[in-house]
């Protein structure tokens, strides 16, 4: 849902930008440089420049990462991403983005429980030998976990705790495997999906 909103907002911004360009062209043609500078200043204050980053060949994954990674960076979280995807996968874009979105959202929340200098997320999404899709993620956190048997539970006060369950269900839909684990300072997610 957030990804769709991001794409709609981007399309609307591009459409509106045409009007901005026409206004700038008219002010420039009239050589009204004072008004031109004021207009540009207002525009830049209202719409900070966010450069689109292309992490991989998959447009849906790029849209998701361009939505989530700036939030991580604004929170002083160091991110190390390696995303190498083929042109097509048997995993739908919706399911892939659901998995990655839940992983990253949980990782960002986990990082927020430690001091800024210790915040780190590593995410690798690759295929091996054209037989498996591997998603490996790790993030720092405060080491506090809640479990019911081997099932991780949310530690957030108002959290719903369905992110990891959603990942598990989605991966199993493709006959894949998921393993979540942790040590005193890091949380790990290891996913393998046959392709």
Residue ranges and their predicted role:
Residues 38-45, 57-75:
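Short beta-to-alpha transition helix within the HATPase_c
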Residues 53, 57, 79-100:
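Conserved short strand/loop->alpha-helix "switch" segment adjacent to the catalytic nucleotide/phosphoryl-transfer site
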Residues 118-131:
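Short beta-strand/loop element within the Bergerat-fold HATPase_c
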């Amino acid at each position: 849902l957030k990804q769709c909103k991001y794409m709609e907002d981007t399309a609307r911004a591009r459409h509106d930008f045409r009007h901005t360009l026409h206004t700038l062209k008219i002010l420039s043609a009239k050589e009204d440089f004072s008004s031109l500078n004021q207009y540009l200043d207002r525009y830049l204050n209202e719409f900070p420049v966010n450069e689109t980053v292309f992490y991989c060949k998959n447009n849906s994954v790029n849209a998701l990462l361009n939505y989530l990674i700036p939030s991580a960076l604004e929170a002083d979280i160091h991110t190390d991403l390696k995303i190498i995807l083929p042109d097509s996968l048997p995993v739908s874009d919706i399911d892939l983005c659901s998995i990655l979105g839940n992983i990253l959202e949980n990782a960002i929340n986990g990082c927020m429980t430690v001091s800024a200098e210790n915040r780190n997320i590593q995410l690798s999404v690759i295929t091996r030998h054209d037989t498996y899709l591997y998603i490996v993620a790790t993030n720092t956190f405060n080491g506090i976990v809640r479990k019911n048997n081997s099932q991780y539970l949310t530690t957030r006060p108002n959290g719903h705790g369905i992110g990891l369950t959603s990942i598990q269900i989605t991966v199993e839909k493709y006959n894949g495997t998921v393993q979540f684990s942790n040590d005193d300072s890091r949380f790990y997610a290891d996913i393998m999906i046959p392709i």
